[in-house]
Amino acid sequence: MRTLFIGDLHLSADRLDITKAFNRFLDTELDDADALYILGDLFEVWVGDDLAAPFALELARRLKQISQRLPIYFIHGNRDFMLGKQFTDAAGMQMLPEVTCLDLYGVSTVILHGDSLCTLDKAYQRFRKLRSFAFARWLYSCLPKRKRQAIANKIRSNSQSSNQQKSYVIMDVEPSAVDALFAQTHCKQMIHGHTHRPAIHNFTNGCKRIVVGDWYEQGSVLVVSADGVDLKSLPFDAS
């Protein structure tokens, strides 16, 4: 048996090729799986469950069917932090806290989206703190739909522009934040996404940090079993 981890698909109506690739993944990669974990940024942007796009609603129906035979877990990312219970219920997904510990075939593991580890990005961490307040999210949800969409588009545009000017170091995780989370959770393994830099990092103390990749040019899935871990790339169908 095996457990699968994915993240940073950034699904949108503008990139239906990614949705197609994800559906193919759901068709071909879930055999003998114990569970599927989605580590945030399933969608490129999410302004509210009441504004879910048709392709997202169709995906929810697909995931709901799969959830009848396979548990699907979801952790919020920085792009879909407004995704709520209405959608997760429709998709059959179980929402997890942003930092969750679990036992993976005898290995204590902490899973998260990963944006909280990029502590050198001070501007983003300020925004992250603001949107962590339930009142701020509630206030945003009370705005008219058109206003919410406009704000989301503005934030997305500013983020893309800002990221182009940030250094490689600032955009990556801060080692001290990684060490602190290992110490806080007492786990031996960490799995996250967000940075779009898929890799397996082994530490001298026996700990392991695994980063799942994004789905912009190809798919990425981490397969964990009793035999170990396998970080796989999934080429998109050229057709």
Swiss-Prot record:
Keywords: Cell inner membrane, Cell membrane, Hydrolase, Lipid A biosynthesis, Lipid biosynthesis, Lipid metabolism, Manganese, Membrane, Metal-binding. CDD domains: MPP_YbbF-LpxH. It comes from the Bacteria. It is a peripheral membrane protein. Pathway: Glycolipid biosynthesis; lipid IV(A) biosynthesis; lipid IV(A) from (3R)-3-hydroxytetradecanoyl-[acyl-carrier-protein] and UDP-N-acetyl-alpha-D-glucosamine: step 4/6. Coiled coil: none annotated. Substrate binds at residues 78-79, 121, 159, 163, 166, 194. Its cofactor is Mn(2+). It holds the Pfam family Metallophos. GO terms for molecular function: manganese ion binding; UDP-2,3-diacylglucosamine hydrolase activity. It is found in: Cell inner membrane. The keyword GTP-binding does not apply. InterPro entries: Calcineurin-like_PHP_ApaH, LpxH-like, Metallo-depent_PP-like, UDP-diacylglucosamine_Hdrlase. Its EC number is 3.6.1.54. It is an enzyme of class 3 (hydrolase). It catalyses: UDP-2-N,3-O-bis[(3R)-3-hydroxytetradecanoyl]-alpha-D-glucosamine + H2O = 2-N,3-O-bis[(3R)-3-hydroxytetradecanoyl]-alpha-D-glucosaminyl 1-phosphate + UMP + 2 H(+). The keyword Magnesium does not apply. GO terms for cellular component: cytoplasm; extrinsic component of plasma membrane. Binds 2 Mn(2+) ions per subunit in a binuclear metal center. GO terms for biological process: lipid A biosynthetic process. Mn(2+) 1 binds at residues 8, 10, 41, 196. Hydrolyzes the pyrophosphate bond of UDP-2,3-diacylglucosamine to yield 2,3-diacylglucosamine 1-phosphate (lipid X) and UMP by catalyzing the attack of water at the alpha-P atom. Involved in the biosynthesis of lipid A, a phosphorylated glycolipid that anchors the lipopolysaccharide to the outer membrane of the cell. NCBIfam families: lipid_A_lpxH, PRK05340.1. Belongs to the LpxH family. PANTHER family: UDP-2,3-DIACYLGLUCOSAMINE HYDROLASE (PTHR34990:SF1), UDP-2,3-DIACYLGLUCOSAMINE HYDROLASE-RELATED (PTHR34990). This is UDP-2,3-diacylglucosamine hydrolase. The lineage of its organism: Bacteria, Pseudomonadati, Pseudomonadota, Gammaproteobacteria, Alteromonadales.
